[in-house]
């Protein structure tokens, strides 16, 4: 009998200093059943540093969005949905999860989360297998004509660059929307993003034959709207 395979979905929300403020991991199997999860605000980071924001932005990452996000976290702490945890406590949880499940680690833009965790002292070195869920999405979902048509139909485009290029969005919000045929706005809180957006993407991808052979880096040239638009 084959040994049961588990996955660990990692998601983080960060501070202005490139460390982790909001940390989550979800342990699941191939069918998407959740066996364990960790969702905490990181002591010494969430409560001592400003959340990441962009003063030029006018969306969730701008000043107005920053105030809403801060209020949201305070409410989560007040109602018990989140608690503060030290980096040492997080590392103990991770080690216990690896010991029990030996899961493959994944995240939507894994390199980003690995870097922020390293900056914070969160130790992810115990995972034997890792892959980027964004890259898996690019090769298994986003490169398809159906996905690009869905993005066109829903105007899921990134902002035009100074060189006049506009690309399709390939973020978890749109990819999950494609899978469910219903786009829901990501809250950009770690647990909810991992559980409600990245988990459905993961289970969709790993049902595909040879999905691991189609893990490819994002290449913006392949997602230019002008190359896929038919007037």
Model-derived features: positions:
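Conserved protein kinase catalytic core
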Residues: 17, 138, 199
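Acidic, Mg2+-coordinating catalytic module of metal-dependent nucleases/exonucleases
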Residues: 104-110, 116, 156-231
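Substrate-recognition/cap helix-loop segment adjacent to the acidic, metal-dependent catalytic center
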Residues: 111-133
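A short, structured active-site edge motif that brings together acidic residues
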Residues: 40-43, 128-142
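Conserved non-catalytic scaffold segment of RNase H-like nuclease domains
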Residues: 2-118
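Short, polar/flexible loop-turn hinges at active-site or ligand-entry regions and domain interfaces
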Residues: 76-77, 122-125, 182-186
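Active-site-proximal helix-loop-helix substrate-binding element of RNase H-like nuclease domains
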Residues: 46-71, 138-194
């Amino acid at each position: 009998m084959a040994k049961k395979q588990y996955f660990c979905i990692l998601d983080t929300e960060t501070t202005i200093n490139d460390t982790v403020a909001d940390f989550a991991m979800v342990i699941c199997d191939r069918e998407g059943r959740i066996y364990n999860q960790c969702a905490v605000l990181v002591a010494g980071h969430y409560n001592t540093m400003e959340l990441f924001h962009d003063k030029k932005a006018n969306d969730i990452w701008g000043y107005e969005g920053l105030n809403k996000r801060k209020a949201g976290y305070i409410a989560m702490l007040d109602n018990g949905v989140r608690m503060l945890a030290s980096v040492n406590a997080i590392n103990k949880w991770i080690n216990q999860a690896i010991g029990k499940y030996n899961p493959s680690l994944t995240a939507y833009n894994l390199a980003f989360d690995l870097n922020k965790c390293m900056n914070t002292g969160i130790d992810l070195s115990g995972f034997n297998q890792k892959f980027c869920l964004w890259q898996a999405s690019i090769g298994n979902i986003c490169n398809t004509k159906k996905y690009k048509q869905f993005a066109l139909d829903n105007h899921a485009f990134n902002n035009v660059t100074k060189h006049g290029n506009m690309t399709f969005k390939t973020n978890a919000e749109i990819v999950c929307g494609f899978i469910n045929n219903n786009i829901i706005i990501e809250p950009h809180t770690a647990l909810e993003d991992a559980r409600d957006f990245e988990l459905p993407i993961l289970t969709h991808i790993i049902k595909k034959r040879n999905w691991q052979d189609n893990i490819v880096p994002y290449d913006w040239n392949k997602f230019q709207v002008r190359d896929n638009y038919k007037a």
